[in-house]
Every structure is written in structure tokens, then in C-alpha cells.
Amino acid sequence: MFERLEQIETRYEELGREMADPALIADQQKYQKTAKQHRELEDVVEKFREYREVQNGIADARGMMNEADAEIRAMAEEELASLEERLPQIEADLKLLLLPKDPNDEKNVVVEIRAGTGGDEASLFAAEVFRMYARYAEQRRWKVEVLSMSESSVGGAKEVIAIIEGDHVYSQMKYESGVHRVQRVPATETQGRVHTSAITVAVLPEAEEVDVKIEAKDLRIDTFCSSGPGGQSVNTTYSAVRITHLPTNTVVSCQDEKSQIKNREKAMRVLRSRLYEVEMERQQQALAKERKQQVGSGDRSEKIRTYNFPQNRLTDHRIGLTIHQLAEVMEGRLQPVIDALTAHFNAERLKAESEAVA
């Protein structure tokens, strides 16, 4: 591990020198590429330098233990205990930083939320979960753009498809895919009974054109009049677009914009991301089979979370996390949940990596 860390540090320093070269600065495209590589190595190098500093401090403290002065020996003993306590965490951080990066972590995401079992109550909850993600995105200074929304008659959402753009969005949102279950007393319930409803969430990394090759001959594009809640026509022009990818029978519709061109662009963004996810799943399954481990962080059929409103309780079933701050989470304060999930799945990756090496 340490030989690899030294190689990374050497490369980091080389990139730093290259960035100071006026010839590179003049070529902004190359400069940006070099700066990106430099940034990607920065966290590892800083942690490695911290590790080395602590190791040197431990060596110095041990040397001072031989001093004749009792006060100096006591200080050295205290310093040694403090540094040795820090070392295991730094080593764990280094191992984590050396894990292969998820190439999608920096990407924007397409979020698809659909009401499942529970009728009107499920549609209301789907709208609330979308609002929760929108509030969370606002706190992270991300941009949310609704691509498509199908409203229910009670003001909920049968389906919401949106793009969230910003810094490392997929890295924070990727563990949200799955079935989200809600337990509460609906406003229409006269007996005060708790009902259970469910929605599905899919989080897809937004694919660029270079990520997925789509042939024009593989697409069927239909246009139709936009419709609102209950099916009434809201637009007399054929601005709504439905795109079918014939080889996979993947269908995407978009009718939010008045312009057919804009609706087509939005639909293509979703289609690219769905096809990219299909290819990602195929690769993950092949890797899981090879390593004989289960891939479970993105299965949309997996019940991942329960929101119990009477008890103000959120439970994430994948990691056994329970918090009694549901009201705050629904306001977008989702970071503690995301941090716990990230820590859990990173630990799983570390374990899998260790077993693969063994």
C-alpha cells in the first residue's frame, strides 16, 4: 500500500509542476484536464502526508522516552499515546481513499419517483418525497429541473422525473433507489387507522452522449397533445413527445415544455440515462458473479426505507438505521442518513476488496 502511496505522491508533485508551466497554462483544455487529475489525487496525498507526520511524531516521542528528565518523559508518553490513537483511523481513511472510484460519482442524476401501492395516499407521498429531495438539493446548492410530472386528482404525483445537477450529485443520491414505504393515518381516514403505502425511487447517473451510443434508426418518435390531471387537453399543438428505443423497448415521454424540440431534448436525456443504467447493471452483475458477492445498493424492488409518521421515525432497513427525526428529514435534512449509508457501503467495499486480495 505504501509503495503505491509514494507513487501517487510523486505523480501529484509532477502534475503540480506541469500546472506551473506557461505553455500548459496557454492551452486551457489541457490545463483543465491536468488540474482535474491533480485535484483527484489531492485527498490521498494530504492523508498520506498526515500519516507520515504522525509516524515521525511517534518516532520522536519514543526517542524522548529515554530522556533523563522525568517531566520530558511524561510529556513524551502523553504525546505518544495521542499519536498512536490517531494512527488506526488515518490508516483506515487511506485504505478507503485507495479504493477504485465510482466513475459515476461526479455525474448529475435523473430521479424517477412513482406512486405504488396505496392509491391517492401513495401519490401524495411521492410528491412529498420529491419535495424532500428538492429541499436537500437546495441545501447542497444543486439545481433541480422537472422533466416530467403526472399529477394525481388529489394534488399528489403519480410520477415525477427530474434532473438534479451539481457537484458530485450521484455520490450522494445513489443509495436512494428502491421501495420507500410510508405508514400514517390518511386525511380521509375517519377511524384513525394507520395505512401503509409505497413508492419506488430510481436514481440514474445522467449519461452524456459519449457514454451511450444511440442510433437514429433504433428510435421511434411519436408526438401527441399534452394532457393535464384527469386527461384533459392542455395544449392543442402536438408538442408532447414519446420516444421508444426499439432494441430494448424502453419508452420515455415528455410533455412539460410548450416546445416539441425541448420536450424531445428532455426525453433523450432520460432515455440515455436509462440505457446507461441497463449497461451498468449488466456489468455489476458480471462482476458480482465473478467475485461471488451480492450487489444490493441499487435494486429498485428492494424495500429500503420506512417512514412512520405517527412515531416520527425513519428506518433504513439495509443498514438497521433508525432515527426519530422524520419531520426534519422530510424538510430535506437527509445528510445524516446519506452519510450513514455511504459509510456502510464503503465498509462493505473495503471488506470485499480485502477478500479479493486474500
Swiss-Prot record:
**Chief subcellular location:** cytoplasm
Gene Ontology MF: a single term: translation release factor activity, codon specific
Say which domain of life the source belongs to. Bacteria
Record PTM text: Methylated by PrmC. Methylation increases the termination efficiency of RF1.
Coiled coil stretches, renumbered: none
What the entry lists under Pfam families is as follows: PCRF (PF03462), RF-1 (PF00472)
* N5-methylglutamine: residues bearing it: Q232
Query: Sorted alphabetically, which SMART domains does this protein's record hold?
Result: PCRF (SM00937)
* Keyword RNA-binding found: no
The entry's localization annotation reads: Cytoplasm
Q: Name one GO cellular component term.
A: cytoplasm
Alphabetical UniProt keywords: Cytoplasm, Methylation, Protein biosynthesis
State the family it belongs to.
Belongs to the prokaryotic/mitochondrial release factor family.
PANTHER family from the entry? LD18447P
Q: What does this protein do?
A: Peptide chain release factor 1 directs the termination of translation in response to the peptide chain termination codons UAG and UAA.
What is the name of this protein?
Answer: Peptide chain release factor 1
The species this protein was found in: Acidobacterium capsulatum (strain ATCC 51196 / DSM 11244 / BCRC 80197 / JCM 7670 / NBRC 15755 / NCIMB 13165 / 161)
Gene name in the database record: prfA
